[in-house]
Amino acid sequence: VVEILSALSIRMVHLSRLAEELILWSSQEFGFATLSDAVTTGSSIMPQKRNPDGAELVRGKAGRVFGRLTGLLSTLKALPLAYNKDLQEDKEALFDTVETVLLSQKVLTANILGAEFHSRRMREAIEARQGYANATELADDLAARRGMPFREAHAAVKALVELARSQGRKLEDLRLEEFQEVAPAADHGVYEALRTDAALARRSAVMGTAPSRVREALEDARARWQPRKT
């Protein structure tokens, strides 16, 4: 039983993290997703507010499942290696955990199926470059393509970010001459390295962010969950 609770606790870690992503993505600050009316509620004070109740409840249920596992482990730690009546405590923990996990999966499924994802807003958030998220791509490009030691490439890109930030510019808005003042090995290829689509495509390792790898992961997930013919 304790092994089942352990496995289900790990599953709830993943479900809770997914729920947290949905909560963040549906917030006004992110604006990456809109959850359906079926899994949200309004506010008694603020008429415009949509509370992601379903996802929040799943996140909370994770703590409940972890508590069941911790409780049973605490019971087991003091038992001799034989059957004891204390072990009756595992039934309530097991049944409650299984029911909680199954319900959490249904709720998250409803959240995802009913959600509207705003890809344009996601791209806008990336391309705003407020955090210079493409700086690492530039460092990797200087090291891999132009042969700079990564330590030097890292320092050069840090200086370029400071330059761009001080002027309220994006890295890709810098002139080639400005790149070369800090990193003489830089050429016009740095602009390709800084493009969002190019950066995603380069991450082509298994489970990477390249579109081809994302499609593979989706196809694999669908295949795993297809009803098995007997």
At which residue positions do the language-model features occur?
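Glycine-rich cofactor/substrate-binding loops
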Residues: Q48-T230
